[in-house]
Amino acid sequence: MQKTKQKSGTKQKLTIAAIFGAMGPGLLAALSGNDAGGIATYSSAGASYGYKMLWMLPVMTVLLIVTQETAARCGCVTGKGLASLIRERFGVRKSVLAMAALLIANTAVTISEFAGIASGLALFGVPASISVPLVALLVWMLTMSGSFQRIEKILLLVSCVFVTYIVAAFMAGPNWGEVAVDLVVPNIQNDPSYVSLVVATIGTTIAPWMIFLAQNNVVDKNAGEDDIVLQRIDTVSGSIAADIIAGFIIITTGTVLFPAGIQISDAADAARALEPIAGQWSTVLFASGLVAASFLAACVLPGVTSSAICEAFGWERGADRSWDEAPVYRGIITAIIGISAVLVLMPGVDLFQIMMTSQVINGVLLPVVLVFQVVIAADRHIMGANRNGRVWNVLTWATIAVITVLTVVMFVLQAMGYGA
């Protein structure tokens, strides 16, 4: 009787209104991945190798769906964030490993967001010495007060100017036959730059922080087991939308920049890919989207990181807690923002290289988070009937193995001097 009631309740929720009402956590988490580092990585892929890296996107879309759906399902079933589940399942010592990986990866990405903000505002003539301190202060104030949630949808909307890459791709006139072939035929090269770009693409598409964000967002919405189907729709749609945009960024830059031999070294180079649609306004369009996307992620990352660490070790957390009540939570946020801003302002730093390197770090550390996630999601005692199936487990472990091998290959090729 109880199962029938739950089943009919789930069916009742599967209305258009319910589906749109459930949209948010998965969509926000996936689209937030198209941040400064994401734009830099996808643009570099197209500018450096044309369409040859498109084959990764269908694969990455499936794996993104797997990891994000797993995160959402774990949140619905347990009502807890991933950090809390890691502590309960593995204990404090292994939680230290997971949180260290998350802290390193997220700090690197936050640095890249400030690099993106500095690069974008520089296209408007605002020097980094002015833009970075002011934006860092604004990010800190919004994160500390919790008022960021009031503007996150606006920022997400503005950052969606990158949807223009879809139009720009068609206007640029790519060879669609070549696009179709490269979309399904893998291309592997024994070049450390290519391999590191593959790792960066994985890291920016399936970022560790996105997994924690997706699960926390579901928990914050008080979603339960009856909401799993709705959250799955949200996750799948968000993942597909994010990777479609990523694909068209590669197609656009592969059509406009690659044939001209233009290697992307800064934001101005990347903006040239939008000239087919925006002409002289391409710089303004690109800069607006880059700043909005970077600011969105810069506001999300410190809070996600601090919340996860405090959750893992049982410390007070939340924007509604004062410094006296949650000193570690507020201290971690302040440290991440401060360190990121200072490093970006250091003389002679390559802002574009910062954005790229952060995604490689993401990719290298991703397996650490995925191991914890897949073990938890497959645990009958934690997940019950909603534990991972065989296909989900195989895909996740395969992802872990592939990234680990790619990381080793990347470092070996660099050590041997290939591509030098």
Language model features by range: what are they?
Residues 160-187, 195-216, 372-381, 406-418:
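Hydrophobic alpha-helical segments and their helix-loop junctions in multi-pass secondary transporters
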